[in-house]
Amino acid sequence: MPAVDILTELKARSIEGVMFHDKMREYFLYLGLHGYAAMHSFHETEERLGAEKLTDYFMAQNGSLIPDKALTAPDVIPAQWYRMRRQDTDAQWRRRAVRDGMTAWRDWEKSTAVLLKDIIFRLASENETTYSRIAEQKLSDVESEIAGVEEIIFDLESIEYNLPIIIEKQPDIEKKYLTKITFLMTPVCTLGI
């Protein structure tokens, strides 16, 4: 398989990741959990910048574009949520929604890791070392994200998804991730590096 076809898959998964995290941002905003929403805004920004890095490098090396692949936005938000107001939900429903959202996130990242391992193998088989390294870096980021979400799930399970505790932590989480987004978007030349 030509490397460009493999890179098309890699680019497509990155763009699907942007869409996934955008939907997760909406998901947690709907639940009134602004910290978790900011966390997904950060991951959305990371995914977008990763896709840009890949396409920019490919264009610089080959003078051409990585072809687009027809994509469908990941189905994250349950259909019934579009027909109801969040004020119509109770605490048990919201606890379950937090649990389901975190599980969906972990499952998404695990399926991304499986795909990336396959992409790395195929790129290495085509002797595309540089692109294989780009995919390996993305896999490392995804594995870190999996570890992070599993830690969040563990913490949430240990407090039995206690909403007052979850809500109390949101401002600190939001501040942390808004700072990370600012850092991601700051050009290197202004960082004094």
Language-model segments: which ranges?
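Iron-associated oxidoreductase/ferritin-like identity signal
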Residues: 1-193
